[in-house]
Amino acid sequence: MHKIFSKNNLIFFVFGAFIFVMIVLQFFVSSENATKVNLSQTFEPISWLHLLGTDDYGRDLFTRIIIGARSTLFVTVLTLIAIVVIGVTLGLFAGYKKGWIERLVLRFIDVGLSIPEFIIVIALASFFQPSLWNLVISITIIKWMNYTRLTRSIVNSEMNKPYIKMAQLFHVPTRTILIRHLTPKIIPAIIVLMVVDFGKIILYISSLSFIGLGSQPPTPEWGAMLQQGRDFISSHPIMLIAPASVIAITILIFNLTGDALRDRLLKQRGEYDESH
């Protein structure tokens, strides 16, 4: 048990250090250097001046990755906020109100989740003009369903408990029950799902930008940088390896953090399996 939580604490430390480093680095790089073309410095090798070299337009790769993190992570956070607001709200009402509202939401979710998420996201993104903002809409349209289903499940398990029955008996307003009594019960599970989905959404955004449905040049974004580096994989592989590595490391950190949060949540509930 001690080893399990020592491992989790290490993961939390790495997660915090990663976020801290990404924030601090934003103050040491200029967004102008990430887009400014300098044809006299194309394909510069790795050096102290250019930590990852330069690309085919003479732009510093390290700077573009750091500024690209701003675009990728900001859009990911914005997408998660939209997903949580929509998903949790629908889940609360579906679980509390029951009746036709619950049946309608559940049937819609059953249909939506029967199709692979990424296929739907690609189909939706292809209808919009390529941009990061349209990716927010496309991903939100499909991802809210998981949050609605999770929220409804938790609400259903809470509805038969004495504190909810007493609140209803004393005619406590529905809004008060939903916000003050039920919402705190779902927050831990929602946070775990958000952290796990953070990595998935980064992958979606990067993948869609890679195939031309997301960020457009010259905006630095990790997926768009992958698309650009693909053309130089033989002559200058660092242009592909650098953004791919950052994407992989970021997703891994968020996935491990999500697993650690889930383990801690289960431990608090007394459901943790030590053989896990």
From Swiss-Prot:
InterPro entries (alphabetical): ABC_transport_permease, BP-dependent_transpt_permease, MetI-like, MetI-like_sf
SUPFAM superfamilies hit by this protein: MetI-like (SSF161098)
Cell compartment(s), UniProt: Cell membrane
Gene3D superfamilies in alphabetical order: MetI-like
Source organism, top-level taxon: Bacteria
Domain annotation ABC transmembrane type-1: ranges: 69-258
Gene Ontology cellular component annotations, sorted alphabetically: plasma membrane
Residue ranges of the TM segments: 10-30, 73-93, 108-128, 186-206, 238-258
Entry coiled-coil feature ranges: none
Topology relative to the membrane: Multi-pass membrane protein
Family matches, as Pfam families: BPD_transp_1 (PF00528)
Gene Ontology biological-process annotations: nickel cation transport; transmembrane transport
Keywords: Cell membrane, Ion transport, Membrane, Nickel, Nickel transport, Transmembrane, Transmembrane helix, Transport
Xref: NCBIfam families: Opp2C
PANTHER family: D,D-DIPEPTIDE TRANSPORT SYSTEM PERMEASE PROTEIN DDPC-RELATED, OLIGOPEPTIDE TRANSPORT SYSTEM PERMEASE PROTEIN APPC
Family, as annotated: Belongs to the binding-protein-dependent transport system permease family. OppBC subfamily.
Assembly and oligomerization: The complex is composed of two ATP-binding proteins (NikD and NikE), two transmembrane proteins (NikB and NikC) and a solute-binding protein (NikA).
Function: Part of the ABC transporter complex NikABCDE (Opp2) involved in nickel import. Probably responsible for the translocation of the substrate across the membrane.
Name this protein carries in UniProt: Nickel import system permease protein NikC
Natural source organism: Staphylococcus aureus (strain bovine RF122 / ET3-1)
Species classification: Bacteria, Bacillati, Bacillota, Bacilli, Bacillales
Gene: nikC
